[in-house]
């Protein structure tokens, strides 16, 4: 069976895709270029994180995780370039998908530092959240950020996320337990009717 990794979502300026293992070099290039930018706000990474082999395995696992409704990781690619060659400029993940009476997932995301301030993450996450609610049938998304990460807080506010609390020593980042602001977004009565620009 040939795996063509179809585009999951398209926005005005972006494609959001579940990538195949042969995209490992492009994913690695994104992470290497943003090591100093995303590292300080990310949990510890395995020693092999910055290797093509790690990403080939991880991308194969991502496809299985989506198939079995465990998680969904998409990468952001700018429109206007062939999909097989387009650089990766960000990512978004629905992790820890929980079904049954909860119907929830944890939202995570990152953007290449060279593309910040253009509204791309808001654009991507608006489409991704709508997909989570409509196509995936989720009811609630949770997204947490470091208190000092004002850029991430602003993105979440624009999407309609509501702060729900403050968790002390919530996540181990760079060897230190860090506090996080807890936020959530509940599915609208009619998908696609959330928040403004």
Regions from the PLM with identified roles:
Residues 37-61:
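Conserved GNAT-fold acetyl-CoA-binding loop/helix
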Residues 65-69:
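Soluble sensory domains of the PAS superfamily and closely related sensory modules
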Residues 60-64, 130:
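Surface-exposed alpha-helical segments enriched in charged/polar residues
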């Amino acid at each position: 069976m040939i795996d063509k990794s179809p585009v999951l979502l398209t926005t005005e300026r972006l494609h959001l895709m579940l990538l195949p293992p042969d995209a490992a070099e492009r994913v690695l290039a994104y992470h290497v270029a943003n090591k100093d930018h995303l590292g300080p706000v990310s949990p510890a990474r395995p020693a092999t994180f910055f290797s093509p082999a790690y990403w080939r395995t991880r991308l194969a696992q991502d496809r299985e995780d989506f198939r079995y409704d465990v998680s969904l990781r998409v990468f952001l690619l700018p429109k206007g370039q062939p999909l097989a060659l387009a650089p990766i400029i960000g990512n978004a993940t629905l992790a820890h998908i929980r079904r049954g009476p909860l119907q929830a997932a944890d939202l995570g995301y990152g953007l290449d530092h060279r593309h910040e301030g253009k509204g791309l993450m808001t654009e991507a996450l608006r489409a991704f959240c709508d997909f989570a609610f409509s196509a995936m049938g989720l009811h609630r998304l949770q997204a947490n950020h470091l208190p000092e990460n004002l850029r991430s807080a602003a993105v979440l506010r624009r999407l309609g996320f509501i702060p729900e609390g403050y968790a002390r020593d919530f996540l181990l980042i760079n060897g230190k337990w860090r506090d996080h602001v807890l936020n959530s977004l509940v599915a609208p009565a009619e998908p696609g009717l959330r928040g403004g620009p």
